[in-house]
């Protein structure tokens, strides 16, 4: 079994948005699976999949663990940009508050 790489793609910097939102957090989303395919240029054993549902993830894993097990497997998991935990939201608020304080005099 070769490696399976998972890239969790939420389309941006969700953590940074929770700390301090701004236009600098809007980024161009890359075609990560296309990038992997470009790197191996058809000359290596490589399997890529872009999944958006649990069913698609199951299918990709079955391929990665089955017929593509001898390949480098790259699975991009697309999640909603606002898919975040309550704990992350609370942490972001605390960091944002700390960032807005004046500097500590030395």
From Swiss-Prot:
Q: Which residues bind Mg(2+)?
A: 10, 12
Q: Which cofactor does it need?
A: a metal cation; thiamine diphosphate
Q: Which InterPro entries match?
A: PDC/IPDC-like (IPR012110), THDP-binding (IPR029061)
Alphabetized, the UniProt keywords read: Decarboxylase, Lyase, Magnesium, Metal-binding, Stress response, Thiamine pyrophosphate
Question: Per its UniProt entry, what is the enzyme's top EC class, as one word?
Answer: lyase
Q: How is the cofactor bound?
A: Binds 1 metal ion per subunit.
- Similarity field: Belongs to the TPP enzyme family.
List the EC numbers from the record.
4.1.1.1
This entry's comment on induction and repression of expression is: By hypoxic stress.
Any single GO molecular-function term of the entry would be: metal ion binding
Q: What is this protein called?
A: Pyruvate decarboxylase 2
- Its source organism is Zea mays (Maize)
User: What quaternary structure, including any partners, is listed in this protein's UniProt entry?
Assistant: Homotetramer.
């Amino acid at each position: 079994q070769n490696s399976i790489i998972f890239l969790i793609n939420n389309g941006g910097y969700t953590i940074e948005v929770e700390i301090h939102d701004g236009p600098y957090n809007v980024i161009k989303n890359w075609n990560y699976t296309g990038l992997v395919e470009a790197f191996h240029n058809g000359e290596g054993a490589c399997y890529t999949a872009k999944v958006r549902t649990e069913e698609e993830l199951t299918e990709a894993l079955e391929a990665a663990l089955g017929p593509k097990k001898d390949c480098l497997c790259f699975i991009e998991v697309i999640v909603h940009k606002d898919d975040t935990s309550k704990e992350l939201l609370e942490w972001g608020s605390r960091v944002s508050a700390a960032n807005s304080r004046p500097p500590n005099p030395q």
